């Protein structure tokens, strides 16, 4: 990941303004410590802080077309850049950067090229021939981007809020899957997949199609000119990422540069579920595994810094971001600049424990759609900013556009959790990789139940955070919360504590509006809380809050179903390879 800042139409091309842009861009340097670039054209500025992953020697930004009339500052990775270059043979490229294709695609197609990009990205492009500009963000919002407006009529774009919040009167999170065009006067959606309107799909489940789509997604993300690894908690998602990456690493260009030994990384409190499971998977796969232990106090000491970098006061996100933030620092110290991570699977496939309560396939599917649309405010934000705080890039194969299209086209009847048929959450994914001849993972790992990252690193982590917040927030403070924080009022002492830290760094109302609110149970949307009347009394975002939906509940449901149906119960669903 890199850091970008663009200021356009600020009616000021003085040296003082240039110095201010450099100062603000410096706030993003943790994202891109390798090099800094600045392009100025009259009263327009494009700044860039580079993390060099592809073509480290010549890919400095901003990037240009042949005559430098088009300039672009990009934060992202374009996985199909070689294919796109083949379609642009009449163009002369200056670098080997994957992102340079953006300038040339604009020359060739105008503004209608964004959907041709396969990757994660946020960019701002300036056409100096008419001083027009566009900005765009990837389909799901893997890559962060904010847009702001100055009193002088200027439009601002930045990878993180901290680079524009002081100088903009109003700002907001740039919506995923959108393009901003100065010519057309605002935002419009470029990403319009079939699932976006939330209509229930009807494609039958084919395990091999799903498996192949995910393998392709992982293979794409092995594109790197620097050392990389995989974040491995030992849960289903990270274990599959590691297993697939290892299976295809030897034939990749990355292996020719860095060898075929895969590095994996895990963090947790002493004796945590993730450390144990991660070690077991690493031993099975034969990876070079790196374990990092932290204490509750280590995490508490980092909370302020985490909130500054993550730019949220959402309880779930902060709980999960803190260990990831600590781990990323350790990873960077080992010389690793890119990691693969397992975000997105739970949203796409209904992996959170509360999906057990979905009343029917329609509501199940609609909830997955809502969760995917909100990913940029939660898991994408965490994965990107926790790692980028230390100059590490996180890639998320489950959010590959093609894999998403395949997974979201499956009739959700196949995704429903049905213990009587042996189907726990994400059964369609588990079954797709249940290969008897060439196993990807041991059975008990392949069918390990979901743990939220903040739970899996050790249950005492969340309890420690609550205890710490209780010491800093009194009953009186919480009772007056609606007066102190009338917008998105915190309902717990932990939420109040995080909010006070956030407001210290980001005091403007526009900043607090970038953080979503509303009731949630075990990471659900507010709508899904309606699925179980008891949840409204226990709105803790931890996975443990979905009481009665853990392993014991599954066993009870299966036993009850077996007793009811007798011994002739047959699972009619397709097995992998049939």
Curated annotation (Swiss-Prot):
Active site: 2
Factors inducing expression: By light and sucrose. Down-regulated by dark.
Domain Asparagine synthetase, chain residue ranges per copy: 210-450
GO molecular function per UniProt: asparagine synthase (glutamine-hydrolyzing) activity; ATP binding
Swiss-Prot/TrEMBL keywords: Amino-acid biosynthesis, Asparagine biosynthesis, ATP-binding, Glutamine amidotransferase, Ligase, Nucleotide-binding
Top-rank taxon, per record: Eukaryota
Any Pfam family matching the protein: GATase_7
Binding of L-glutamine, residues: 50-54, 75-77, 98
Pathway field: Amino-acid biosynthesis; L-asparagine biosynthesis
Protein's job: Essential for nitrogen assimilation, distribution and remobilization within the plant via the phloem.
Name by which UniProt lists this protein: Asparagine synthetase [glutamine-hydrolyzing] 2
């Amino acid at each position: 990941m890199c850091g970008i800042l663009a200021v356009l139409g600020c009616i000021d091309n003085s040296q003082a303004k240039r110095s201010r842009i450099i100062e603000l861009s410096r706030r993003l340097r943790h994202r891109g410590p390798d090099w800094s670039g600045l392009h100025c054209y009259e009263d327009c500025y494009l700044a860039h802080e580079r993390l060099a992953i592809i073509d480290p020697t010549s890919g400095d930004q901003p990037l240009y077309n042949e005559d430098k009339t088009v300039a672009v500052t990009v934060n992202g990775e374009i996985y199909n850049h070689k294919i796109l270059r083949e379609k642009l043979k009449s163009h002369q490229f200056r670098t080997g950067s994957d992102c340079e294709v953006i300038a040339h695609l604009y020359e060739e197609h105008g503004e209608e090229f964004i959907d041709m990009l396969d990757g994660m990205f946020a960019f701002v492009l300036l056409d100096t021939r008419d001083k027009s500009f566009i900005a765009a963000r990837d389909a799901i919002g893997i890559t962060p981007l904010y847009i702001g407006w100055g009193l002088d009529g200027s439009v601002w774009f930045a990878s993180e809020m901290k680079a524009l919040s002081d100088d903009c009167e109003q700002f907001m999170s740039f919506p995923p899957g959108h393009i901003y065009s100065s010519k057309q006067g605002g935002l419009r959606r470029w990403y319009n997949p079939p699932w976006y309107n939330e209509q229930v799909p009807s494609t039958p489940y084919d395990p091999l199609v799903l498996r192949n789509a995910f393998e392709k997604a992982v293979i794409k993300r092995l594109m790197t000119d620097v050392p990389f690894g995989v974040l491995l908690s030992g849960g289903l998602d990270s274990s599959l990422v590691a297993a697939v990456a290892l299976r295809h690493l030897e034939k990749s260009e990355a292996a020719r540069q860095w060898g075929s030994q895969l590095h994996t990384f895990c963090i947790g409190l002493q004796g945590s579920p993730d450390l144990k499971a991660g070690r077991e998977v690493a031993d099975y796969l034969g990876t070079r595994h790196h374990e990092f232990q932290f204490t509750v106090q280590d995490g508490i000491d980092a909370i302020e810094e985490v909130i500054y970098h993550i730019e949220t006061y959402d309880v779930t996100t902060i709980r999960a971001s803190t260990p990831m933030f600590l781990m990323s620092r350790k990873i960077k110290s080992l010389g690793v600049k890119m990691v693969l991570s397992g975000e997105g699977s739970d949203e796409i496939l209904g992996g959170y424990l509360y999906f057990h309560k979905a009343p029917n396939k329609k509501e199940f599917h609609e909830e997955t759609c809502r969760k995917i649309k909100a990913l940029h405010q939660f898991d994408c934000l965490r994965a990107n900013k926790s790692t980028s705080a230390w100059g590490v890039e996180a890639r998320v194969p489950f959010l590959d556009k093609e894999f998403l299209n395949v997974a979201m086209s499956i009739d959700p009847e196949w995704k429903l959790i049905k213990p009587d048929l042996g189907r726990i959450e994400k059964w369609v994914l588990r079954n797709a990789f249940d290969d008897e001849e060439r196993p990807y993972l041991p059975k008990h790992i392949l069918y390990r139940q979901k743990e939220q990252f903040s739970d899996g690193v050790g249950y005492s982590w969340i309890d420690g955070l609550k205890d710490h917040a209780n010491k800093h927030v009194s009953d009186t403070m919480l009772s007056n919360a609606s007066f102190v924080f009338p917008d998105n009022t915190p309902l717990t002492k932990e939420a109040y504590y995080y909010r006070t830290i956030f407001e210290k760094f980001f005091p403007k109302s526009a900043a607090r509006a970038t953080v979503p609110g509303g009731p949630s149970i075990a990471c659900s949307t507010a709508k899904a809380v309606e699925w179980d009347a008891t949840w409204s009394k226990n709105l803790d975002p931890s996975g443990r809050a979905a009481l009665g939906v853990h392993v014991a509940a599954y066993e009870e449901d299966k036993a009850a179903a077996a007793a009811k149906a007798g011994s002739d119960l047959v699972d009619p669903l397709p097995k992998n390879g049939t």
